[in-house]
Amino acid sequence: MAPLRIYKRKDAIMRPTDFSAEAIATLLRKQKIARMPKLMGAMGTNARRTVFRKLKELAYRTSYSHCGRYYTLDEVAEIDAQGLWSYREVWFSVYGTLLSTAAAMVEAAAVGYFVEELDNRLHVGTKDALRKLVGDARLTREKVAGQFLFCAADSRRRRQQL
């Protein structure tokens, strides 16, 4: 009887398939926005990591609405003067995430924002994001007429906003 031989693989075997970022770019130029499953389908892969690797090669944005599930190209987004763009009720910002966008909007405002005002401006609920920004000392809040007015963390800027 021949001795039993055990072979060990030392390296992971990777598929030799080459993926191109152009497949993602073509899809996003045509449809303007897409979610991860569509991007994976356009590339012909089931691996999210592959899509993220190819997205790095492109100038792209993720939505601040819909938990960042939508993607678009910078060249497709028609950003307004306040740094926002929407397509089919999906919102994107030059500032990136909802936290960064809310902070930038409040800091740039002539006067602070009440939650409802910022909700209307950004078209999403901002209460939790504002609470986190205050907790992280990125913004402050002042009680005005029974409601919280959110202002910049910088004391000089905050005095101007009140």
State what each model feature region is.
Residues 45-54, 122-135:
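Short amphipathic alpha-helical interaction segments
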Residues 56-97, 135-162:
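Charged low-complexity interaction tracts in eukaryotic proteins
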Residues 16-32, 94-110:
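Positively charged, polyanion-binding regions of nucleic-acid-associated proteins
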Residues 27-71:
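A structured, charge-rich N-terminal accessory region that forms the first stable segment of a protein
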